[in-house]
Design a protein with these regions (language model features):
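Short beta-strand/turn micro-motifs at beta-sheet edges
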Residues: 2-8
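Short glycine-/aliphatic-rich beta-strand segments at the starts of folded cytosolic domains
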Residues: 9-29
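A common structural junction motif
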Residues: 40, 80-90
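RNA-recognition motif
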Residues: 52-59
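Helix N-cap motif at beta-to-alpha junctions
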Residues: 66-73
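Short, low-order "capping/linker" segments at domain edges
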Residues: 101-115
Length: 115
């Protein structure tokens, strides 16, 4: 009896860096989380938990989300599809992906993105 080799493997993680453009003001974590939740439901009809989506770091304009590695493309699509946060029109530009928070922070934010 052969088992598929990917069974029992723990999920691998990806972190995606992004920048909110098109507006001067910064946003709250909860407003960005809400926009991500709504967009995920709108596009895929699923919950953010299904993709492992979590806002890990965010400073009002720049942030980092977590997802399971098999959903990296979908996660990027969700971020880039968001065009409103609250009542503000925005664009979200993804700036990099990595398997660790530390290397994404170094590569995409010069190590400056705090919790």
């Amino acid at each position: 009896l052969l088992l598929a080799s990917n069974q029992n493997k723990k999920p691998r993680h990806r972190y995606i860096g992004f920048i909110i453009t098109g507006v001067e003001k910064g946003f709250s974590r909860s407003a960005v989380n809400k926009a991500i939740r709504e967009e995920t439901l709108k596009i895929f009809g699923k919950k953010t938990e299904d993709f492992g989506l979590k806002l890990i770091r965010f400073n009002g304009k720049e942030g980092m989300i977590h997802c399971f590695h098999i959903y990296k493309t979908e996660a990027i699509h969700i971020l880039q599809s968001i065009n409103k946060i609250g009542k503000e029109n925005v664009r979200i530009k993804t700036v990099g992906t990595s398997g660790t928070i530390k290397s994404l922070n170094k590569k995409s934010f010069k190590g400056k993105l705090e919790r």
